[in-house]
């Protein structure tokens, strides 16, 4: 019987097999960008209508959901916004109707008193068309502190209501009377504002509101409340208040420091670019998606 030889095996052997490497873990998906939480509804205003293409681009790419809608008015005669309501509504824009009535130019901070028969050359709303028209010798004066009377306020309220109706805004829509910043609300300005509010209430089709600076808001609110009470109208006039302190688009309108503010304008004459289109705007936040919608 054969016996196996002692000693190391002579059978050749190859390298030991290596374990298959584990695949690298897939990278974690990026964390989703948290949605922007807003307490109000951002909107903007700008003096001249930017054009349909620009408005469509901004509606698709910007955070803004409503826009100021200027009526032709004594201190702002440009008509570029006229006839655009349906176009803007079709794009999804809300609106805030603005009427720039008579102003107490002598009381505007930093402004020299204007001639009584012409509109100031540096009109607040950047309206070169209105300035040129007002300065033309053949044009009768339309914007003058000489017209700060209750009777004129009532007459121009009728004008504002007629133009708002002609633009197709529904009954109950808010028309904001633009009252630019003053050092103090004079008796003449108070009379004009009271007459204008009373005139819109008497017309019955629309709701009078006020645009003003924060420092003038309380005085103008008292005037508005008195006019509402005299007509037996419950509630307050809507207020659109301007003040730049602490403003962001995420704020609610009451962040301006007034609990009755429905709109806060907090960024002025600022160039912004959305979708490749640059506009110079005033930025606002409102308590509704369309600040002139019937309340």
Predicted features by range, described:
Residues 105-114, 216-228:
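Glycine-rich, charge-decorated loop segments at or immediately adjacent to ligand/cofactor-binding or catalytic sites
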Residues 188-205:
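Long, well-ordered alpha-helical scaffolding segments within enzyme catalytic domains
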Residues 201-222:
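Aromatic-lined carbohydrate-recognition surfaces of secreted/lumenal glycan-active proteins
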Residues 34-55, 60-65, 69-192:
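Substrate-binding cleft of extracellular glycoside hydrolase catalytic domains
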Residues 6-39, 115-116, 121-133, 137, ...:
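N-terminal low-complexity, Pro/Thr-rich disordered segments
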Residues 30-47, 55, 225-295:
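Functionally critical loop-and-helix segments that line ligand-binding/catalytic clefts
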């Amino acid at each position: 019987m054969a016996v196996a030889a002692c000693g190391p095996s002579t059978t050749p052997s190859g390298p030991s097999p290596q374990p298959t490497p584990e695949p690298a873990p897939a990278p974690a998906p990026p964390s989703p960008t948290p949605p922007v939480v807003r307490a109000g509804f951002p909107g903007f205003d700008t003096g001249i209508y930017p054009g349909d293409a620009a408005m469509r681009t901004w509606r698709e790419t910007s955070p803004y959901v409503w826009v100021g809608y200027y009526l032709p008015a004594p201190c702002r005669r440009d008509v570029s916004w006229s006839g655009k309501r349906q176009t803007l509504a079709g794009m999804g824009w809300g609106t805030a109707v603005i009427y720039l009535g008579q102003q107490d130019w002598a009381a505007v901070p930093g402004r020299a008193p204007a001639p009584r028969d012409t509109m100031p050359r540096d009109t607040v709303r950047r309206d070169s068309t209105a300035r040129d028209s007002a300065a033309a010798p053949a044009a009768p004066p339309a914007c003058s502190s000489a017209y700060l009377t209750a009777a004129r306020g009532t007459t121009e309220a009728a004008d504002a209501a007629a133009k708002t109706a002609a633009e197709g805004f529904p009954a109950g829509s808010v028309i904001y009377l633009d009252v630019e910043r003053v050092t103090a609300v004079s008796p003449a300005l108070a009379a004009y504002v009271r007459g204008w509010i009373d005139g819109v209430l008497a017309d019955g089709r629309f709701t009078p509101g006020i645009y003003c600076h924060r420092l003038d808001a309380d005085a103008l609110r008292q005037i508005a409340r008195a006019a509402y009470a005299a007509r037996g109208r419950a509630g307050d006039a809507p207020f659109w208040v301007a003040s730049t302190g602490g403003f962001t688009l995420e704020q609610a309108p009451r962040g301006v420091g007034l609990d009755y503010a429905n709109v806060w304008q907090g960024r002025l004459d600022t160039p912004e670019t959305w979708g490749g289109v640059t506009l110079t705007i005033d930025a606002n936040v409102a308590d509704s998606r369309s600040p002139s919608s019937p309340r």
